[in-house]
Structures are given as structure tokens and as C-alpha cells.
């Protein structure tokens, strides 16, 4: 009985395509891959870029600039003018920013 079931189901197994390993998922076609892969495309000829601000200003927030050396800058300036009464008291990073030219922009 087991032999009969095995022999009768064998032709059905030949009709199902067998999964095979794809060498490079980034060049394979979507139908060849059973899942949705994420490919990271890199150009091997291109050298990695150095981070901006590396050196003396390392570890600083890129949005914060140093004030001018003259010392005439009064400090952070408001980016959006006066605060309304609905805003929380005190400066927030969104409403306060430091400018390099000491002029509000």
C-alpha cells in the first residue's frame, strides 16, 4: 500500500519546480528568489568618503556652528520669532538654533 502511494505521488513531485540557490541575489530575477531581499549596491572603484566635520569638530551636531572669533555674537537666535502662549516654556532645539553670522535668517 505504501509503495503504491509513493509511486502514484512521484509524478506530481516532478511537476513542482525545485528551489535552487542563487549565486548573487542582487543580479537574480525576482521570480528566482522566494523572499524580498534588500541589496546594497556599492561601487568597488569608488573610495569611501570621509565624514564631514571630522577632525577638530568631531562628535558635534552638524547643525551647530561655532560662533565667530570676535565674540560679538549674542548667542542663539530664534528661528521662528516670538513663541505663542501654547508652546512650552523655554527654548527647544526646534525653535532655537545657532547661526554662524550672528544674524537671524
Swiss-Prot record:
The keyword Thylakoid does not apply. One of its GO terms (biological process) is blood coagulation. One of its GO terms (molecular function) is serine-type endopeptidase inhibitor activity. It is found in: Secreted, Extracellular space. It comes from the Eukaryota. The keyword Signal applies. Plasma. Coiled coil: none annotated. Residues 38-105 are annotated as: Disordered. Transmembrane segments: none annotated. GO terms for cellular component: extracellular region. Residues 43-53 have a biased composition (Basic and acidic residues). Residues 1-17 form the signal peptide. Keywords: Blood coagulation, Hemostasis, Protease inhibitor, Secreted, Serine protease inhibitor, Signal. Most important serine protease inhibitor in plasma that regulates the blood coagulation cascade. AT-III inhibits thrombin, matriptase-3/TMPRSS7, as well as factors IXa, Xa and XIa. Its inhibitory activity is greatly enhanced in the presence of heparin. Belongs to the serpin family. Forms protease inhibiting heterodimer with TMPRSS7. This is Antithrombin-III. It comes from Gallus gallus (Chicken). The gene is SERPINC1.
